[in-house]
Amino acid sequence: MRKSASRRLIAAASLLLSISAADAAASPTFDVKPERGLLTRLLHAHASQFELGTIAADGGQERFRISKANGHIKVEGSTPSALLFGVNWYLKYIARVQISPNGIRLGSVRTWPLPAAVIEKEATYAYRYALNQNIDGYTAPYWSWPRWEHEIDVLALSGINAMIVERGMDSVLYRTFRAIGYTDGEIRDWITQPAHQNWQLMGNLCCFSGPISTSLLRKRVTSARRIVARLRELGITPVLPGFYGIVPADFQQKFPDAHVIPQGEWAGFTRPGWLDPREPMFAKLAAAFYRYQREMFGDSSLYDMEVFQEGGTSGDVPVPEAARDVQNALLAAHPNASWMMLAWQGNPREDLLDGVDRRHLFIIDIDHDHVPRDDREKDFRGAPFLFGGIWEFGGRTTLGANIDNITDRLQRLGRTNGNMVGTAVFTEGMDTNPFAFDLFTEMAWRGQPVHAAQWVADYVRRRYGAADSHALAAWKVLLSTAYAIRIDDVKFNSERDAAQESLFNAQPSLTVNRASNWAPEAMRYDAEGFKQALPQMLRVARELRMSETYQYDLVDIARQTLANESRRLLPQIKAAYDGGDRRSFESLTRRWLHLMDMQDQLLATNRFFLVGAWLAGVRSWASTSDEAARLDYDARSILTTWGDRKASEGAELHDYGNKDWAGLTHDYYRVRWRSYFASLDAELRTGRQGNPIDWFAVGDAWNHSARRYSDQPHGDAYVIAKRIEKTLNLESPRP
C-alpha cells in the first residue's frame, strides 16, 4: 500500500463516525428498499431489471460489484452510496444511458444488456460531499419537494454521501434567541429571507427583506425535515450548520455582561456580532441551539461553522481558546461530530488550527489552486480535507471548467497528501456544466488520472445515444476550448477556475469586460475555435436530437456562442462611438440588441434557462400578498442588484448572480443596453453628454416588477440555433 494511501485510511478512520455511509460499512447488510425507490423514480420500468444486494466492505473501503443473476442485472454495495454508484457505473458503461442534473436519456431499448463479466470497484475516497452553502441562495432557496427529491436522487446516484442542509435553520435560530428573551418580532426582523439567508448563517449579513413570517418558518422546517429524512434513507449524511457565536447587533445591549465582538461589514451589509466563545452565555446558547436542532432534525455527525468567513475579526479574543470552546460546545452536544469548515481566503487560520482537536475537523479545500498549493498535509497540520471542485460562481450559466484540475491534479494531491480523504462538489450553483459534474463525481472512484479524450468519447455515447461523428467533433472542440481553461492566465484575485461571463449581462459600459466584479476579465479560451462546436452539434444525426440531454447541450453551446460574440462586438461599438461614426454605431448596436433577442428566444426553449421557473417556485411559500411581494423581491434581487444600493454599488455585488435566462435577458439585460445605447446615440446626435443612468434604480425597478414569466419552455431550439449559425456566418463542417 502506498504511504499516502495508508495515511489516508488512518485519517478516514478518525472520521469513521462522521459519515453515516461509513457506519453502514461496518454492517454487511442494510435495507435496499430506499435505493429501489430511487431507481423506480429515475429509471421507471427499467428499474425492474435490477436486483439489489449488499456486500461487506473490503478492508474498510467501500465497494460495489456488478454481475448478473436469474436474468437480472445484479448490483451489490457495501453502503447505500456504493450500491447506487454501482448502478450508475452500469448505466454509464454498459447500458450507455445517462442520468444527469440537466436531463435524463434512457434510450429506446426496452431491455438493457446483462453485464458480460463481473465488475468490482472500490472507492478511492471515503467522503463524497456535495453543495456549496451558496446553493441555498443561487439555486435552491425556493425549491419544492419534487424538485429537491429529484436533485437528491441524482446526487445519490452520483455517489454523494454527505450534503449540507441549511433550510430550516432559521427556526433553530428563532427558538434559540426566543428562549433567552428576544421577542417574536425582534428575532423575525433579524432573520433574513431564504435567497439571502445562507450568508447570515455564515456570519456575513442579517435582516434583508424581512421580517420573515412564522408561516414561512414552519413551511421551511417541514420541508427540511423531509429533505433530511430522504438523505438518511439513501445513506447520505446531512451536514447541518453549527453554532459558533453569531448574535443580533443589539445583543450587548440586552446582555451587558456579554462580550460581543462587532464584525464590521461584509459587502456593505452589517455583519452579525460574534459572541466570545469563552463566555458562559456562549455555552448556554450553543446547548440550546443544538437541543432545538436535534428536536427538529435529529442528530448528525458533521456541522458546518464558518468563523471569520470572508472577513470579520477576532478582536481581543484569543482565537485558539475561542476555537477550542466552539469545538467543545459541538462535542458536548455531539461527541463524535466533526467541524466542517472551508479552506478559503486565508481560512482556516493557523491560530484556529492551534486550538482544536484536528481529528474532529472536516476541511473543504476550495483554495488549493487559487494560488496553487500542494502540501495540504502541512498546511492543515494533518487535519482531514476534501478536494473541492468550484468551477462556477454565483449560479451563473457560463459553460466551461478547468478539466485538468479534475482529471490530473485531484489524483496528484491525493497521492501526495495522506490527509486527503474525499472530494467535494462545491460550485456556487447547480444544474450547469453537467459534463464537469459527471467527471468530478466519478473521480472519487478512480485512483489514476483519466484520459480525457476517451472519457469524453464515452460521455458522448451515453449522453446522445451513439458515437455520432459530429457530436464527437463538437466535444473535441469543447475539450480544447471551454474545458481547457488554465489558472495561470488570469490575475490572482479572479475566479481562476471559471470561464468568462457574457457581456450581454454586464452593467453597460463601452469598456466593460465582465458582468460581476470578481469574474475573469477576458476570454479564457479561443472564441473562434469554440464557434466550430455549434455547426457540428447541428449536424448530429436527426434520430439523436430529441433527447433531453442533446437539447440542453445544443442550447448551452448556442447560448455560449452568442455570449462570446458580445466580446467581439463591443470593441467595434466603442470604436464607432469614439470615432463619431453614428451610422456604424447604430448599425452595430442594432446587431447587439438583435443578438440579445435571439439569445432570449433560444433560452425560452429549455426549462433550465427560464427566469419564470425560478420565480414560479416562490409563490407557494407565501401566505399573503405582502409576503409574496417580499419573497419575489428576495428571489429577483439575488439575480440583479444582489442587495441594497450600498451592497450593489459600493461593494459591487450587482450582477454577481447573473444568468442567461429567458425573460431576464429580454426584460432586464436588454433594457439596460437599449437605454445605454440610446443615451450614447443622443450624445452623437447632439454633441452633448447625457446624464448618467442610475443602474441600481433600473435593477430595483425590475426587482419590484409584478410581471409574470412562463415557467414552461416554448419554441424550437434546433430552428433557433440554425438561425444563430446563419446570423454569425459560422462555417459549416465538411461532410
Sequence positions of predicted segments:
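Active-site-adjacent substrate/metal-binding segments within catalytic domains
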Residues: 125-144, 155
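Catalytic-core regions of glycoside hydrolase
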Residues: 47-49, 98-99, 104-112, 131-135, ...
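Second-shell loop/turn segments in exported
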Residues: 72-77, 136-142, 214-215, 276
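Extended, compositionally biased alpha-helical segments that mediate assembly or anchoring
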Residues: 658-735
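Bacterial N-terminal signal peptides
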Residues: 10-20
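Bacterial N-terminal signal peptides that target proteins for export
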Residues: 2-10
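Contiguous, structured surface segment used for ligand recognition
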Residues: 25-125
